Amino acid sequence: MVGEKLVAYMLVSVLGLALLRSVFGQHMPEEPCSVQILVPGLKGEAGEKGEKGAPGRPGRVGPTGEQGPPGDKGQKGSPGRYGKMGPTGPKGLKGDMGDPGPKGPNGEPGVPCECAPLRKMIGEMDIQVVQLTNELKFIKNAVAGIKETDSKVYLLVKEEKRYREAEVFCQGRGGHLAMPKDAAANRAIAGYVTDAGLSRVYIGINDLEREGHFVYVERSPMTTFSRWREGEPNNAYDDEDCVEMVSSGEWIDVACQLTMYFVCEFDKDTV
């Protein structure tokens, strides 16, 4: 490529001289002249590597790359601040009635009084009590169908209540839920239930204070007598702490929140 350029340059120079000679040949003296032809030299050897140049300007932003795979799951962060208190929830159901409280201390002695009028009044009241007692016996036997043994009076209450409510009802009338402590009492209560056409009633036995340790409702321990149905007590669902009697006289442990009829027991000498 360089050689071709050199030949072309020489031809142009010769043609230029020939043209000058033809134009100005008559007037030019024939004196010798020198012609200098400048010919580019050959390519030199490569020089030494120069110093590192300054950084160029930032290039254009390249196209967006493909989405990379998800990174590893980060560590669990620290708990945030407590949020605002939520709205007040609905009012809950009324709970069961609690056990009766302990007996309070005796009151202060009364002031002295004239007792003669009171004795007369008490005598008159005793007469009325005798009359009322006779009337009550009639009601027991003829209307209410109350059952009696040598020492106990049993009252069947045909009003469905939970266990604790039933015991409070009996206590409010001077008694407790029926506590069959021997075979005779158990037969009397079972016969009462059968005669009334019922299938089951609450009786005064539970293990509310210690699971599996059944006691009578007035907290006296059970001794030798029991009438559990086969497979009972089984504490099904871990929620059977009270006892029912079925018409056959057998006992079954049941949940205390069930509602059913019940039998109250009273000492005969207090009725």
From Swiss-Prot:
Compartments it resides in:
Secreted
**Quaternary form?**
Homotrimer; disulfide-linked. Interacts with MASP1; probably triggers the lectin pathway of complement.
Ligand binding (Ca(2+) 1): D207, E211, N235, E240, D241
Q: Which residues bind a carbohydrate?
A: R200, E240, E244, I252, D253, V254
Lineage of origin: Eukaryota, Metazoa, Chordata, Craniata, Vertebrata
UniProt GO cellular component terms: collagen trimer; extracellular space
Keywords of this entry: Calcium, Coiled coil, Collagen, Developmental protein, Disulfide bond, Immunity, Innate immunity, Lectin, Mannose-binding, Metal-binding, Secreted, Signal
May I ask which residue range the UniProt record assigns to the signal sequence? 1-25
The answer on whether this UniProt entry bears the keyword Manganese reads: no
Gene name tied to this protein: colec11
Q: Where in the numbering of this chain does the Collagen-like domain appear?
A: 44-103
Pfam families per record = Collagen (PF01391), Lectin_C (PF00059)
Q: What name does this protein carry?
A: Collectin-11
Give all residue intervals belonging to the C-type lectin domain: 149-265
What does the protein in this record do? Lectin that plays a role in innate immunity, apoptosis and embryogenesis. Calcium-dependent lectin that binds self and non-self glycoproteins presenting high mannose oligosaccharides with at least one terminal alpha-1,2-linked mannose epitope. Primarily recognizes the terminal disaccharide of the glycan. Also recognizes a subset of fucosylated glycans and lipopolysaccharides. Plays a role in innate immunity through its ability to bind non-self sugars presented by microorganisms and to activate the complement through the recruitment of MAPS1.
